[in-house]
Amino acid sequence: MSSSTSPYELKDLKNSSTEVHAAEQENEIEYFETDSNDRPSQQPHLDYEQHNTSAVRRFLDSFKRADQDQEQEAEVAQMNDLTSAISPSSRQAHELEKDETTDKIAPHTGHKSDSLKKTIQPRHVLMIALGTGIGTGLLVGNGTALVHAGPAGLLIGYAIMGSILYCIIQACGEMALVYSNLTGGYNAYPSFLVDDGFGFAVAWVYCLQWLCVCPLELVTASMTIKYWTTSVNPDVFVIIFYVLVITINIFGARGYAEAEFFFNCCKILMMTGFFILGIIIDVGGAGNDGYIGGKYWHEPGAFNGVHAIDRFKGVVATLVTAAFAFGGSEFIAITTAEQSNPRKAIPGAAKQMIYRILFLFLATIIIVGFLVPYNSDQLLGSSGGGTKASPYVIAIASHGVRVAPHFVNAVILLSVLSMANSSFYSSARLFLTLSEQGYAPKIFSYIDRAGRPLIAMCVSALFAVIAFCAASPKEDQVFTWLLAISGLSQLFTWTAICLSHIRFRRAMKVQGRSLGELGFKSQTGVWGSIYSCIMMILILIGQFWVAIAPIGEGKLDAQAFFENYLAMPILIVLYVGYKMWNKDWKLFIRADKIDLTSHRQIFDEELIKQEDDEYRERLRTGPYWRRVLAFWC
């Protein structure tokens, strides 16, 4: 070695020698019991990890606990995902965005998922965001809602929930921008803005929600298959879908972005095609029934129920299904808050939400109401003995159209499997989040070398076994239970977001802070959150009424109560249990004691005003089409 060798070169050579020595020792151990002639010749300059370790060994080693550096990287990735436990489809959009950003600043780790991170494009994020909500609640759960409420009641329920959702998107956008780096996302807001016990209870119920969604989607998938065949045991299909979901989450999916892009394109095209074909069938241009018009709004009627109280009860019951169908939409605001210009993107996301509510939800629900009577024995939740199917399939098949129903049913199957995969992913990450926040045992924070929360995934897989009830004659009841838990849990999450926003604005006022510090102010203001909070409390009260006096007989039924209201007792037990354990009985954090500095991004009020003035000037002096685009988009 020459005397001119630098200390850095000496250090590198020492490290290289150490690595080679370690590799030789490991080779000694590995081939200790093998014939000496089988032992490969030692080549000190070969990379042991790459050349001497088989793919199977690397795969098995990936389940070992990550070392300190890997664990830190994995935890960063998991914390980027913890707000993504919201909507299955939107959650994946956020994950992909975060992965793309992380890949630009993080060193190459050698993971096979790196190539996926580099392929994420805006078109993936856009289509995944548009496809949010087109799943079990809308495509299958609406069958039960139509039976209970009738076509007009179903439409009213979705319209009410849509108005609430718009205010929630505004509040969530404001909070997401100022707390964009907060561990736990919007699940963490109540812990420091409302009350720690309330935050604990809501976070656990939210985790329970996504635990329930996975078996719910698997059951729905088996029910969807019944449209084609009823001779095969449904559990056979559940096994296939169950193994598929777990396999994807163990190995990942190299082409996940393109797959989700494909799935969501299919959903959007299906909903658009259904709307057009539905209009053609309704006016007599296709099918065997000629002109239909609003026939089913007159016979059997627009509402289900003889008395006004029964009709009102049907609308109330519809609201939970609508909440589940809209579930995860609030995450669009979270994703938008992390784009390059969130102050302009969040209002656009709110407008996008209006269009989704109007065209993908309300418009197609109107068509379903025109083409499917609420007393059809094929609807889920009906008392008839017909084969249960999606109301979207029934709307086409019952009028003599042959090929299209199979395409619609196939897209529905893809939709529910996509959501099953996403919900499994989310529930495991939520367990990790709870552990990081101190709300769950530390064992759930185990992260392997591939960045998977392995213990949490095992719990999620065990919970998904509930789906094997698909062959039971009580399948419809289990579906109703899981749907009610998920729907009510979504209402709790939305209530927590709105209540946190109200308390945040109150603390800003009490502590004399200017709203100009906010990068984006909710267009509906604090009154929008108050409206949403009041409406959701009324919905919870109404759902309690429906639970103790079910639609139909109106008699108290314990089974019907737990089918419709199981999530509320769970929330109460978690809240009271936390208070008893910590001996902390305060109801809320006082506004003057709320911490408004930690984790919060404070914007320059003068700079924001200058940016807004410049933006308005560019619109004023720019072409007319740009002003039109800014108004509508």
Curated annotation (Swiss-Prot):
Biased composition regions of type Acidic residues, renumbered to the chain: 25-35
Sequence segments annotated as region (Disordered): 1-52, 81-116
The organism of origin for this protein: Saccharomyces uvarum (strain ATCC 76518 / CBS 7001 / CLIB 283 / NBRC 10550 / MCYC 623 / NCYC 2669 / NRRL Y-11845)
InterPro entries referenced in this protein's UniProt entry, alphabetically: AA-permease/SLC12A_dom, Amino_acid_permease_CS, Amino_acid_permease_fungi, APC_YAT
GO MF term (any one): amino acid transmembrane transporter activity
Residue spans, topological domain Cytoplasmic: 1-124, 170-197, 253-260, 335-352, 414-452, 499-531, 579-633
Function (record text): Broad substrate range permease which transports asparagine and glutamine with intermediate specificity. Also transports Ala, Cys, Gly, Ser, Thr, Cys, Met, Phe, Tyr, Ile, Leu and Val. Important for the utilization of amino acids as a nitrogen source.
Membrane-side (Extracellular) residue stretches: 146-148, 219-231, 282-313, 374-392, 474-477, 553-557
Subcellular location: Cell membrane
TM region(s), chain numbering: 125-145, 149-169, 198-218, 232-252, 261-281, 314-334, 353-373, 393-413, 453-473, 478-498, 532-552, 558-578
Gene that this sequence comes from: AGP1
Name used for this protein in its record: General amino acid permease AGP1
This protein's GO CC annotations: plasma membrane
Source taxonomy: Eukaryota, Fungi, Dikarya, Ascomycota, Saccharomycotina
